[in-house]
Amino acid sequence: MGVADAPSPGNVPVLGDMKNRSAAEMKISVLALRALTLVLLVIALALMVSNKQTQSIPIKLPGMASTIFLKKTATFSQITGVQYYVGALSVAVAYMFFQMLAGLFTILTTGSIVGSKSRAWVTFILDQLIAYLMVSAATVVAEVGYIARRGETKVGWNQVCSDFKHYCFIYGFSLVNAFLATIAFLPVVAVSAFHLFRMYGAQSAQSK
């Protein structure tokens, strides 16, 4: 190796500093994305649970000249799909809060964001499950919302958003936050997978 190819004395510290800085930035980014996901999930859940509207619906019965009005109240508990959405988001909120606390504790005690290999496996599997849960919940509610807005004439379902405009608006706002939470969480899922398989890559390199 010639003189020109020899590493300068400052190369190793500089590369080490860059690696440490990159690892620190990744830790902060993952925690920030988990926090953002948690906030969006809480907003989506709070909007759906608190969403309620009572409206007088005009009904004209056959053989009656006058129109009667029935009071109806729209809430999340009336539709099974929306109940699933509320339950799924509740689980996701609890998980995200726990993972944030566990992540902070792991960073403060070990300096790593994943800790041991077993912890990395648990995080990887649970992140995958929660991501699927969030996607399925948002998809179900999106389909229910579409039918509520457009109706389904083939099975005789009328659209109801013309009568419950405020409820449908809040419903849609909750759904938007749920999809944004899912988008924010996807990079976290990718990072947890990256950390797990990097552990096995490092172990394989050491054994050679």
From Swiss-Prot:
A Pfam family that the UniProt record links to this protein: CASP_dom
Main location, first listed in the record: membrane
Lipid bilayer topology: Multi-pass membrane protein
Keywords: Cell membrane, Membrane, Transmembrane, Transmembrane helix
Location(s) in or outside the cell: Cell membrane
Top-level lineage group: Eukaryota
GO cellular component, one term: plasma membrane
Spans within the Extracellular topological domain: 49-87, 142-168
Cytoplasmic side: 1-27, 109-120, 190-208
Keyword Iron-sulfur carried by entry: no
Residues that span the membrane, as ranges: 28-48, 88-108, 121-141, 169-189
PANTHER family reported for this sequence: CASP-LIKE PROTEIN 2C1-RELATED (PTHR33573:SF30), CASP-LIKE PROTEIN 4A4 (PTHR33573)
Subunit structure: Homodimer and heterodimers.
Similarity-based family: Belongs to the Casparian strip membrane proteins (CASP) family.
Protein name as catalogued: CASP-like protein 2U9
Originating species: Selaginella moellendorffii
